[in-house]
């Protein structure tokens, strides 16, 4: 079993009586009908349908937790708060006070079903993929000993085809370009959310001309998220044997 402390992810807390309805109106996923004990991928888009953040939405006490890129957390919290208006919703950036770990491999245990959540006190475990689990909770309560660096978890995410929108790739891609429709992060039957018309039009009119693919790069090739190459754009990259592995949006 491998365990890595995850520091590139931030975490927002969305609480209050109207938290579910508020997120349902903002995100690409049907949050109103999210089953109890289930997390989901979702996107938050601009009015032009471009992803401002890729999110893992996790039901928690009195509301939800939103996992996203750490470099986006303060800005997303601030901009989301602008839409609260009179709703009974409180949005807080808890990135500094919560700890997140990735656990995977032989011996890793947690909820059996994909996206299922288990709770042990304030500690939450989310099944994010085959024998891969996200464990998070208040920093003073999570007692896990890392066995490897965070880049090892990033490599697992890349191999699973799970994109992370960062400051370098923010507001550049509609959700389908990073395969959010295939990953279950978009619900085309739900009502309006920011950018919904453009996202739906791209889907039903066949206007998605770029898609995210996995690729390898040889040793010595320096790649970073947001970097453009041969018509494509790097979404994420991590060291691997004899080079690196990456996710990139490419023409199709």
Question: What are the language-model segments listed below?
Answer:
Residues 1-54, 61:
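Acidic, proline/glycine-enriched N-terminal capping motif
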Residues 2-5, 10-11, 56-160:
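Acidic, low-complexity central loop/insert segments
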Residues 24-32, 74, 78-86, 204:
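Short, intrinsically disordered, mixed-charge
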Residues 38-54, 85-87, 116-123, 199, ...:
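Short amphipathic beta-strand starts and helix->beta connectors
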Residues 43, 106-119, 218-232:
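Short amphipathic alpha-helix segments
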Residues 150, 156-181, 222:
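Short, conserved active-site entrance elements at the starts or edges of catalytic domains
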Residues 178-186, 200-252:
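Glycine-rich, small/acidic residue-mixed loop/short-helix segments
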């Amino acid at each position: 079993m491998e365990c890595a402390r995850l520091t590139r992810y931030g975490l927002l807390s969305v609480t209050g009586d109207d938290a579910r309805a508020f997120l349902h109106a903002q995100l690409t996923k049907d949050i109103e009908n999210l089953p109890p004990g289930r997390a989901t991928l979702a996107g938050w888009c601009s009015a032009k349908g471009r992803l401002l953040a890729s999110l893992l939405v996790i039901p928690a006490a009195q509301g939800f937790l939103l996992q996203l890129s750490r470099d986006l957390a303060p800005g997303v919290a601030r901009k989301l708060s602008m839409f609260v208006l009179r709703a009974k919703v409180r949005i807080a950036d808890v990135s500094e006070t919560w700890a997140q770990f990735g656990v995977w491999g032989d011996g890793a245990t947690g909820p059996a079903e994909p996206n299922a959540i288990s709770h042990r006190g304030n500690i939450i475990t989310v099944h994010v993929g085959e024998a891969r689990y996200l464990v998070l909770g208040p920093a003073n309560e999570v007692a896990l000993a890392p066995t490897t660096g965070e880049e090892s978890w990033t490599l697992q995410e890349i191999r699973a085809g799970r994109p992370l929108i960062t400051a370098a790739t923010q507001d550049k891609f509609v959700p389908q370009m990073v395969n959010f429709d295939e990953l279950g992060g978009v619900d085309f039957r739900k009502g309006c959310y920011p950018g919904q018309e453009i996202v739906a039009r791209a889907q039903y009119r066949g206007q998605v001309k770029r898609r995210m693919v996995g690729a390898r790069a040889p040793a010595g090739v320096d790649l970073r998220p947001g970097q453009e190459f041969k018509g494509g754009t790097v979404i994420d990259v991590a060291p691997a044997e004899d080079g690196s592995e990456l996710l990139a949006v490419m023409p199709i």
